[in-house]
UniProtKB/Swiss-Prot annotation:
Protein name: Uncharacterized protein YGR039W
Organism phylogeny: Eukaryota, Fungi, Dikarya, Ascomycota, Saccharomycotina
Length: 103
């Protein structure tokens, strides 16, 4: 999944200018993923160009850590919602919609 995420970010950097980035991730070591993803996003200043970022995780309890990490990095939580679609989101039960803080 990290490989896929890398491809998405690389395609964006190489000219696929989009105003959103969709990242789906499901694994036990989500903190390492968050740290690497955050480093990549801020290193390349992707949040300066993205209007929003979706981070979709498989367990809603992980949202607490997400909120802590992104609030500490001045990312506003625009919307938090649950995904319960039985066909498309069988293992996903939370999505965070993040936007760059204007401060």
């Amino acid at each position: 999944m990290l490989f896929f995420t890398g491809l998405v970010i690389l395609s964006y950097l190489l000219g696929g200018k989009k105003d959103w980035l969709l990242i789906m991730y499901e694994a036990s070591d989500y903190l390492e993923f968050l740290n690497r993803l955050s480093s990549m996003l801020f290193k390349f200043e992707l949040f300066e160009h993205l209007s929003s970022t979706f981070l979709i995780f498989s367990h809603s309890k992980r949202a607490v850590k997400l909120l802590e990490i992104y609030r500490s990095r001045h990312i506003s939580i625009y919307n938090v919602f649950l995904l319960r679609h039985p066909k498309y989101f069988q293992s996903v039960d939370i999505a965070l919609y993040l936007t760059r803080s204007q401060t």
